[in-house]
Amino acid sequence: MAEQLEQYDPSICGQTRLALPTTGPMMVSRFPRDMVSLLRCNIDSGELTLTKEHRVAGEGVLNALLHCRICGAEYRIENGIARLLSDQLTLEDKHEMSIRDTVDYDFTNPKPFVPPTEGWRSALSDRLEVPVHLEALQTSASHTVLELACGDGRFTSLIAGKGARILAADFSINALRLLALRLPAGARVARVHADINQLHLPSRAFDRVLTLTPLDSRDERMSMFRKIAQALRDDGRYVGSFEHDDLNRRFLGLPLVRRYSKEGILIEHLTMKSMCLESGPYFSTIRVRPIRPRVPLVAKLPPILAYRILRLTAALPFVRHFGELLLLTAQRPVRLPVEGEYRSGSRVAKGAYRSYMHKKDRKASWGEELV
């Protein structure tokens, strides 16, 4: 089956449509048909619809053609991944995408993930970082979740295990391929190959949004916050983590903007104040707190002892600012006013005014506006 998938060319529309098995690992790779409605055109945000399906698997799609209802632009689903990546990428984006595909998420010989002994994907780091994200997100099986910069599924697989539907986007195609291998059976995950800076989303369509990407400029982050606020439902919740300008960096006078490694990915370290200022215009309720503290020499201790010390550090005033990440939890997205849209107002005031105007045998209007 893998060999057959490699030989298939979705650009050849005359090929026979193949129905694939509806059980087993192949089902995780499909694009859920009921989540196609969440895709939008890169040009005008028009809804995308399936026009030609070349390969189907039960309720999922492996290869198909997508069509914009407004402008007619065409996109593809290839091997279960919606290919929405724009050609208009910055040089920095292209540089990062190359690193992600060739170094971080090499797909030449995929293997089960093995945590490193130290660093941000180590077992100790995950114990400090992963639970607080999931606790803040509070997902359930009834939720539709948007995950931006999903990577190889570090969080996606855990959220999918709770039964939630997930639209998972990343601009590393290899990360999305690895993601399919790491999802639990029956996971409802739609993989999207896209740049989150240019990804268009439907309004008020998601219950939860998760991001784990620093982005490298204030303008990019604020654009992302605006996009997320529009995509969230009124009672939705957004959780994101960002690199923190922590006490270690401040004490040592280290740069706010740097690369993870020489010629690596560009990142910016943020303060709690800057995080609130950037996200504040788009959410009415915001909470920012440092997580995953880094304390010199603690990592050399036995894992259980190190974990307990770092958990305590994360909870104490002042020293919690040793946290290497900032966790943002935002709710109540701010909506732009819509022309002609009435507000609830005061029922008492409206009732009294209408009664008064009725006694005068006149329409209950305020100038040109009906009450």
Model-found features: residue ranges?
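A short SAM/SAH-binding and catalytic strip from SAM-dependent methyltransferases
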Residues: 208-220
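A short glycine-rich, Lys/Arg-flanked "PGG" loop and its adjoining helix->strand segment in the class I
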Residues: 222-234
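Acceptor-substrate binding/catalytic loop of class I
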Residues: 256-274
